[in-house]
């Protein structure tokens, strides 16, 4: 059955990532109804009572460890302050960064992404 327009939304700070996502979602039945925009997570309106799935930058995509730790802390603050009532599933290519988010995990699962032996982590915001 057709996917209602805008039911699933995605964003990224990188236009290249958005273009790749458009190609991939275009292959899905109903994928044309997925709304993708170039936008940093910091610029999103509050996300209340939704499910968030994300693959934030990590080692390969960011250069310095300090930058990654700071990014993850800021991302954790965003989840806590602007995503009340939501569930967030976050992929970590570098397991050491999980603690940098500063939130308690509901669960962690091993998940390979190509050669990366990462973790999918669930957070529940209250």
Segments (PLM) and residue ranges:
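Class I S-adenosyl-L-methionine-dependent methyltransferase catalytic core
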Residues: 1-126
């Amino acid at each position: 059955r057709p996917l209602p327009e805008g039911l699933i939304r995605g964003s990224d700070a990188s236009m290249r990532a958005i273009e790749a996502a458009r190609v991939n979602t275009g292959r899905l039945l109903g994928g044309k109804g997925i709304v993708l925009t170039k936008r940093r997570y910091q610029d999103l309106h509050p996300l209340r009572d939704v499910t968030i799935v994300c693959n934030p930058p990590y080692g390969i995509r960011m250069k310095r460890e300090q930058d990654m730790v700071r990014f993850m802390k800021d991302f954790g603050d965003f989840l806590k302050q602007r995503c009340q009532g939501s569930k967030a599933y976050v992929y970590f290519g570098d397991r050491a960064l999980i603690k940098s988010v500063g939130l308690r995990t509901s669960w962690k699962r091993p998940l390979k992404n190509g050669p990366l032996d990462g973790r999918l982590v669930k957070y529940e915001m209250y």
